[in-house]
């Protein structure tokens, strides 16, 4: 018997800086319910799904900065999303800004979680490949201060059993790094999912702007194919606080084929029928890691 499921992506349109978490959760609940009505077993939501993409601003007030982070998950405002997921029997992946205090020291991470059908958190990932810069740069029309507001993740690239599937996570820039995909592929991930907030304009290299969508889809398709895994990417998209964010949220098959793609720059749900056993086609006949890999020649990747 093949293992079948319906996988969904819940793309978010812009979130205004003034928009409250309560308002955002209502939007997420609508997409969760819509996905479940289409028979989805699991839905992927974007990076930093509860707020606007705040690293585009330079904050000097720590209290204002802290207001964008979650200190518990789920907190009272977010809990209805978990309760509705349990009621509908649909799992989800979702990103948020995490603030923890350890030894009296604040630690901030760009975090993603996996939630199963009963509404329980079964996996956590903290973004490792942080893009952007740490100090204010006046020439930019908007900042990209992830290196200032987050520290690199400390959980590696784990793979979790979520209901019937083995799942791993990326967050935004991670999808561009083949090392992230390969670690999860070696750990047997059948679905690799995550969210992104990707500006269509990159101030340091504006000559690449016309390639933004191409590079996004190239990363997703190559990562899926080279690791024999399904993948799903959920974007926060459209004109958000004078910054245009890339659309093209997608679901990709282990063959590298795009099987679902958003067409709008607003809240949108896409779904695809997923056969998890198709991962074996690639892993047994093309990318058979045990049979063909030669790790003794790859040492330089980890040394430099």
Swiss-Prot record:
Keywords per UniProt: Hydrolase
Entry's pH dependence statement: Optimum pH is 7.0. Stable at pH 6.5-8.2.
Applications (biotechnology): Has potential for industrial application in the enzymatic production of D-amino acids, which are very valuable intermediates for the production of semisynthetic antibiotics, peptide hormones, and pesticides.
Alphabetized PROSITE patterns for the sequence: CN_HYDROLASE
Domain CN hydrolase stretches: 5-276
Molecular-function GO terms, alphabetical: N-carbamoyl-D-amino acid hydrolase activity
E.C. no: 3.5.1.77
Top EC class, one word: hydrolase
InterPro entries: Aliph_Amidase/BUP, C-N_Hydrolase, C-N_Hydrolase_sf
Modes of activity regulation: The activity decreases with increasing concentration of H(2)O(2). Has 68% and 43% of activity remaining upon treatment with 0.1 and 0.2 mM H(2)O(2) for 30 minutes, respectively. Inhibited significantly by 2 mM Zn(2+), Cu(2+) and Ag(+), moderately by Co(2+), Mn(2+), Sn(2+) and Mg(2+), and only slightly by Ba(2+). Slightly activated by Fe(2+) and Ca(2+). No effect on activity by metal chelators EDTA and 8-hydroxyquinoline at 2 mM or by dithiothreitol, 2-mercaptoethanol or phenylmethanesulfonyl fluoride.
Gene Ontology biological process terms in this record: protein homotetramerization
Active site: 47, 127, 172
Temperature behavior of the protein's activity: Optimum temperature is 60 degrees Celsius. Very thermostable as still has 98% of its activity after incubation for 30 minutes at 50 degrees Celsius.
Catalytic activity: an N-carbamoyl-D-amino acid + H2O + 2 H(+) = a D-alpha-amino acid + NH4(+) + CO2
Domain of life of the organism encoding this protein: Bacteria
Pfam families (alphabetical): CN_hydrolase
Record's function text: Catalyzes the hydrolysis of N-carbamoyl-D-amino acids to the corresponding D-amino acids. Hydrolyzes aromatic and aliphatic N-carbamoyl-D-amino acids in vitro. Effectively hydrolyzes N-carbamoyl-D-p-hydroxyphenylglycine and N-carbamoyl-DL-p-hydroxyphenylglycine, and to a lesser extent N-carbamoyl-D-methionine. No activity for N-carbamoyl-L-amino acids, N-carbamoyl-beta-alanine or (RS)-alpha-ethyl-N-carbamoylphenylglycine in vitro.
Quaternary state and interactors: Homotetramer.
Protein name as it appears in the record: N-carbamoyl-D-amino acid hydrolase
Lineage: Bacteria, Pseudomonadati, Pseudomonadota, Alphaproteobacteria, Hyphomicrobiales
